Amino acid sequence: PRFNYDIKFFRSDPMGEINLDFPYLIPFKPGENAKVFDVKTIEGFWGSEEPDSWNATGFQTAPGEPVFASRTGTVVEIVGNTRTGKPENWYHTWTNSVTVLQPDGTLICYRNVIDKNKELEVNEKIFAGEQIGVVPPNTNELILLVFQNSLNSADLRFIIPRFVVNEDKTELLISSKVYSVVHPEKIRGLEMSRREKRRNLK
């Protein structure tokens, strides 16, 4: 007998079990304030097309402001102000971005971040609360997208993360509200091994 089959490649893990209550860190320096805005469009994220349904978190910021990882993961793509390489290898079509594969199989894209000092590398593990870059010149917003490939559809699944707003509380962020940035060690260490905690939590 002959069997027909298709080979599919997924950037994220379509079978990953997502904990919608997982606590994400607000991606700025602890002690600072972060103001949230309503993201109206993700134009340019997926080529000339915009997904029919999507969710994104936007923060007002300023050029040169440090940006920190909201969650532990592995860097899969670092893009400056222009894209190179084969489009079929891209995770999306945004520039000035860092994309990270998270432990639950989802991807997080930090849009409007540059690795000015070239300290990040693809396949490098980064930890929640670790600086990953700065906001580029002439930019006053940072956008976060958490997404996952769908197993039986070309559509992406977008996740609305819950962010840590104080030592013991997480919530969905509200547009136009100002939040104090906190990075509790117990949250930063959630996806670290004991050895990683000793090296990174001081």
Per-range role (PLM):
Residues P1-W94, P184-K202:
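Surface-exposed, glycine-biased beta-strand/turn segments
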Residues P63-P66, V98, K116, V122:
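Short, conserved secondary-structure segments in the cores of folded domains
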Residues G80, Q131, P136-P137:
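Short, surface-exposed secondary-structure boundary micro-motifs
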Residues H92-T106:
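OB-fold (S1/OB) nucleic-acid-binding surfaces
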Residues D104-G129:
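Short histidine-centered loop motifs in beta-beta connectors
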